[in-house]
């Protein structure tokens, strides 16, 4: 899936998002180029060797090919998420008024910013949960069918342990990612939780219906103090609201609509 969707996205950058690509090509192009030259070739070459190497390569070498493909996939994920993290939180760049483009000033600062690191950890944790579930599910099916019970029993145990460890990692990284979002993208968090006004403490929305213009809630079912606890790790922490941030951004950047599509974000 990584290889197939990556090929499609290469065309989308030029055809669907050409203006964006011209504006940030110097920045997003750097990690994507490394991903294409290093990670993509690593995973595609060794995945091919693994597929066509059955009964042709020595067993240890054949095993090494799928490990290298997996490493390539994780490297690929990191470089792609680094480019996405710049879109979420631009850093290590300068604007060139002569070319009307942004230019990269520090590749490693952009590559290893906090947003990229925690997003990668969160994504990989979810990937391991998926992998563990697939292994555990197939193993359970084999046990029920009575096929290779000894192997299936051990792989079921491995898959179950992977799910538990990855789930704990997913919860921790998700919490860390949310707190980084509150600092770097407060409007995104406010929209995701349908918090229209700055609150301290801030409630966690279970279900909210808002007006069509996205200016206020009509009905809301909340958990008191919940969002403050998630966003600040305190029961009475302040979380900025959509309307307050809209007014702040208008004063800072000029008139305009700085709200995301609230129903979709929520």
Report the location of each language-model feature.
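Polytopic transmembrane helical bundles with strong interfacial aromatic enrichment
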Residues: 1-266
């Amino acid at each position: 899936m990584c290889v197939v969707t990556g090929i499609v996205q290469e065309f989308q950058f030029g055809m669907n998002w050409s203006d964006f690509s011209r504006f940030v090509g110097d920045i997003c192009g750097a990690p994507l180029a490394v991903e294409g030259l290093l990670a993509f070739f690593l995973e595609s070459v060794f995945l091919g060797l693994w597929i066509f190497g059955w009964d042709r390569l020595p067993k240890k070498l054949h095993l090494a090919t799928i490990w290298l493909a997996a490493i390539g996939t994780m490297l690929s994920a990191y470089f792609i998420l680094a480019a996405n993290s710049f879109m979420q939180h631009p850093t290590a760049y300068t604007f060139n008024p002569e070319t009307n483009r942004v230019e990269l000033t520090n590749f490693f600062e952009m590559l290893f910013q906090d947003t990229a690191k925690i997003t990668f950890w969160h994504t990989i944790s979810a990937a391991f949960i998926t992998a563990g579930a697939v292994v555990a599910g197939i193993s359970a099916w084999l046990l029920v069918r009575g096929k290779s019970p000894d192997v299936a029993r051990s792989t079921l145990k491995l898959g179950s342990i992977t799910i538990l460890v990855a789930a704990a990692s997913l919860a921790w990284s998700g919490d860390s990612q949310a707190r980084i979002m509150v600092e770097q993208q407060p409007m995104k968090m406010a929209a995701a939780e349908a918090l229209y006004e700055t609150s301290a403490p801030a409630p966690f929305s279970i279900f909210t219906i808002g007006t069509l213009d996205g200016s206020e809630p009509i009905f809301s079912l909340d958990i008191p103090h919940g969002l403050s606890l998630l966003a600040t790790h305190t029961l009475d922490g302040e979380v900025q609201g959509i309307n307050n941030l809209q007014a702040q951004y208008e004063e800072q950047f000029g008139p305009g609509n700085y709200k995301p599509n609230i129903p979709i974000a929520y």
